[in-house]
Amino acid sequence: MSDLLPLATYSLNVEPYTPVPAIDVTMPITVRITMAALNPEAIDEENKPSTLRIIKRNPDFEDDDFLGGDFDEDEIDEESSEEEEEEKTQKKKKSKGKKAESESEDDEEDDDEDDEFQESVLLTLSPEAQYQQSLDLTITPEEEVQFIVTGSYAISLSGNYVKHPFDTPMGVEGEDEDEDADIYDSEDYDLTPDEDEIIGDDMDDLDDEEEEEVRIEEVQEEDEEDNDGEEEQEEEEEEEQKEEVKPEPKKSKKEKKRKHEEKEEEKKAKKVKKVEFKKDLEEGPTKPKSKKEQDKHKPKSKVLEGGIVIEDRTIGDGPQAKRGARVGMRYIGKLKNGKVFDKNTSGKPFAFKLGRGEVIKGWDIGVAGMSVGGERRIIIPAPYAYGKQALPGIPANSELTFDVKLVSMKN
């Protein structure tokens, strides 16, 4: 019986002369009965010892046997003809036949019942001799078993519901529910975007709007330039016509050539100015920063105790956070692969006393020196985070990255 795993406690109270099924139909689980105990309170004044019997349906019994087996039509016809011939003789022996027939029918019914059910005595208990008896009886749901007690005392059976290798698997629905719960509790997806993603999308939208404005201004400037060019050409043609109408004094060829060259130079100068203006417009209102300026504005990294790396993104105002100060923080915590495992971006800020061991050691070291309004990235090696300890969403030996902002401080 070592393969039968106990699942729950089993108990059954069998009152005298009342058959009780061993297994309830609502719980079709194999039971193992290990003890039978006598109830010392008698139901009558006879005080007879109680005998526990087990009644089991015969697995080899079939309804066809109960009904008389298979029938053959030819045999039925022959029997009917024989019955007609013997009908007269049966009438003569009517009085004697009825009595014998009733006795034979009762005997047949008793025999049929005996064939259908098997009854065995398990034990007999008495308050004068023996109160209890140990058993080792295993009953499966497929067996139709009942208990009955004869005597003056009830008998209580106890044992365990057990897991039998041939039982129908239980808890299929529960397993499906557990799978659904795992799906909903799993952290393979994140419905809320990171703040960095939101800020990046907003900046992209602003860049797109600026590009559209620049393009619109370029188109307008080009239209204005075309209109200006057409107006200048019309003015030049009118001036030339006027000059042709007016009587001019005779000029030398050198003077005409010089004037023509001056006009050409003026046209070229105008075109150069327009091209330069358009070029500046395309480049934007500010000149591109040099590498030195870009490096100057790039956040500088510092390596602190235990290899903790900090990058100040925004320098706050006021005094710096020191040991013992109560600080309120906003933060986003990420694993090395960028997956967010925890964050506080709204509601009540996360507050703790700096340097008092209320948070992981990496925070006590990394937050020190910040001012209110300051933003910082803290990269914490595993020994200064949770080390070998695995938490929900955080594997063991994980390097953690926190983007933090100091929103309040009280010394």
Swiss-Prot record:
Q: Where is the composition biased (Basic residues)?
A: 251-260
Q: Any inhibitors or activators noted?
A: Inhibited by both FK506 and rapamycin.
User: Which reactions does this protein catalyse?
Assistant: [protein]-peptidylproline (omega=180) = [protein]-peptidylproline (omega=0)
**Segment Disordered: which positions?**
54-127, 160-302
Q: What stretch of residues is annotated with the motif Nuclear localization signal?
A: 256-271
For the modification Phosphothreonine, the affected residues are T89
- Enzyme Commission identifier(s): 5.2.1.8
Where in the cell? Nucleus, Nucleolus
N-acetylserine found at: S2
Q: Which family does it belong to?
A: Belongs to the FKBP-type PPIase family. FKBP3/4 subfamily.
Task: State the function annotated in the UniProt record.
Answer: Proline isomerase that belongs to an abundant class of enzymes that catalyze the cis-trans isomerization of X-Pro peptide bonds and can accelerate the refolding of proline-containing polypeptides. Specifically binds nuclear localization sequences. May be involved in the assembly or folding of ribosomal proteins.
Name of the protein in its database record: Peptidyl-prolyl cis-trans isomerase
- The species is Saccharomyces cerevisiae (strain ATCC 204508 / S288c)
